[in-house]
């Protein structure tokens, strides 16, 4: 006879518990997930540059700005789709005109700046590159709300190492030296303003031994290379957050 009270208590405690797989439990889990996502403020990213930033010869999803946001969000961040102001063939002067035309008034949580390869390719002066790059960098800092650590300057890849560069008929040693000189300028400007510098030039030189890192046009870089760039650039984002 004493078994019945104990059995009654057992049923009362355990028989009424919800199955984790029940619709009610699923609704609770979904609500908790939604609440967690809503609790993380959405962050914004502005990418300024040229063909390397826009991801010439690869899909948008494979370009480093979009890959970067995807990877950050997979790690628990909440970034909106990046805003990209970039076009194949742009020099620093072209990018200056583009950002002025864009009339950017919004502040971004993070800004990247990668430009200069077309200055080198077109034989433009390093002095004009310095002054124009400095202006672009100052604007980038302003777009980041005046926070230098929320900006990264990304080095210029050495296109002379690509299949196109090898077949171009140009002096590849001269290309390498010129790219190094332009990178010395953008690195110095970044350092002077306390901006994070990201070197992707060394990574990009791997095209010499890995054809899979080059896009089909033989000049630009594949999605695989953009992914390697992201591994380097994400360090700058981590420092800013």
Task: Locate predicted features.
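Short active-site-adjacent helix-start/loop capping segments
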Residues: 55, 91-94, 119-122
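Alpha-helical cap/lid subdomain in secreted, periplasmic
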Residues: 97-241
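Sec-dependent signal peptide recognition
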Residues: 1-9
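C-terminal motif of bacterial Sec signal peptides marking the signal peptidase cleavage site
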Residues: 12-15
């Amino acid at each position: 006879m004493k078994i019945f009270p104990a059995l009654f208590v057992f049923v009362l405690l355990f028989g009424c518990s919800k199955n984790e797989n029940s619709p009610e439990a699923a609704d609770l889990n979904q609500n908790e997930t939604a609440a967690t996502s809503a609790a993380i403020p959405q962050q914004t990213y502005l990418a300024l540059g040229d063909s390397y930033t826009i991801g010439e010869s690869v899909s948008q999803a494979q370009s480093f700005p979009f890959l970067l946001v995807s990877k950050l969000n997979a790690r628990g961040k909440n970034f909106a789709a990046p805003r990209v102001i970039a076009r194949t063939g742009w020099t620093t002067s072209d990018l200056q005109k583009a950002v002025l035309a864009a009339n950017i008034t919004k502040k971004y949580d993070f800004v990247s700046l990668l430009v200069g390869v077309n200055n080198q390719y077109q034989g433009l002066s390093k002095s004009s590159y310095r002054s124009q790059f400095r202006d672009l960098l100052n604007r980038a800092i302003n777009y980041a709300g005046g926070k230098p650590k929320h900006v990264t300057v990304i080095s210029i890849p050495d296109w002379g190492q690509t299949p196109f560069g090898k077949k171009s008929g140009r002096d590849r040693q001269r290309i390498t030296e010129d790219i190094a000189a332009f990178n010395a300028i953008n690195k110095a400007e970044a350092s002077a303003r306390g901006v994070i510098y990201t070197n992707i030039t060394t990574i990009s030189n791997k095209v010499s031994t890995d054809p899979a890192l080059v896009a089909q046009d033989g000049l630009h870089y594949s999605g695989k290379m953009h992914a390697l760039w992201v591994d380097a650039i994400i360090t700058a984002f981590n420092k800013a957050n």
